[in-house]
A protein has these predicted regions:
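C-terminal regulatory/effector modules of DNA-binding transcriptional regulators
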Residues: 146-216
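Conserved amphipathic alpha-helical segments that form helical-bundle/coiled-coil interaction surfaces
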Residues: 81-146, 158-167, 175-185
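Acidic active-site catalytic centers that drive phospho-/nucleotidyl reactions
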Residues: 68, 113, 172
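Short linear motifs at protein or domain termini
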Residues: 1-77, 193-216
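Short amphipathic alpha-helical segments at helix-loop
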Residues: 6, 49-52, 100-101, 145-149, ...
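Amphipathic alpha-helical repeat elements characteristic of tetratricopeptide repeat
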Residues: 54, 65, 88, 155-159
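Short, flexible helix-adjacent loops and helix caps
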Residues: 2-3, 72, 76-80, 99-103, ...
Length: 216
């Protein structure tokens, strides 16, 4: 079951549902609160974190863009074949024959999307950079899920990912930066619109890398 933003988290009810004692539930919620993933209110308990405001979401996307563009500029000149192959494999899974342009398997898509971007961040070979991105992405992914009711924009995300990968394969750092910029801006606009409908240009000015017959 999905608890809507702002709902109170009942420790005893959660413990009963999960078949555990209240202690690990309480400890887990305390840790989530420390990481700003749930809200704690004195004398009232824990609550599902409220949905980010449009400005808060915009701020997170802005920081995410800075991190990803930095990773591209730092590592695009020497990405390594194994990393490109991994990104190509993930791209194929996101846009493979078993997925429709729009579908409700948000959890599956979210995992693939996160792994693609983690591979992109890996270009910088900086654990600190990757950790910072992951901390942001938790909130971005949750907000996107609630705003879109779990419906994800597979087709357009794959197109944008393909432009990023195409630029990296071509060794064009500037084009890769433009592709990341376009993708993050388009993702923000779609998230704010609460719909998978494209609301911005998808063309980053590079030839996309499109896997038609499966990964390399």
């Amino acid at each position: 079951n999905v608890l809507p933003p702002g709902d109170r988290l009942n420790i005893d009810a959660l413990a009963e549902r999960l078949g555990v004692s209240p202690t690990p539930i309480r400890e887990g919620l305390a840790r989530l609160a420390a990481e700003n993933l749930v809200d704690f209110r004195s004398y009232r308990g824990y609550f599902v974190k409220k949905m980010l405001t449009p400005q808060e979401l915009t701020d997170l996307f802005d920081v995410r863009k800075v991190l990803e563009i930095h990773a591209v500029r730092r590592g695009a000149a020497r990405p390594g074949m194994s990393r490109l192959v991994e990104m190509e494999r993930l791209l194929y899974e996101m846009g493979g024959p078993n997925l429709e342009p729009e579908f409700h398997e948000y959890g599956r898509f979210s995992i693939l999307d996160q792994r693609f971007h983690e591979a992109l961040l890996g270009l910088a070979e900086s654990p600190a950079l990757l950790d910072a991105w992951r901390a942001l992405n938790v909130h971005v992914a949750a907000s996107r899920f609630f705003r879109s009711s779990g419906l994800v924009d597979v087709q357009h995300s794959v197109t944008e990912h393909a432009a990023i990968l195409g630029a990296l394969v071509a060794g064009d750092t500037d084009a890769a930066v433009r592709a990341v910029d376009v993708h993050i801006d388009a993702g923000l606009r779609r998230s704010l619109a609460g719909s998978p409908t494209p609301v911005g240009p998808l063309d980053a000015g590079v030839e996309p890398f499109v896997p038609n017959e499966g990964p390399m």
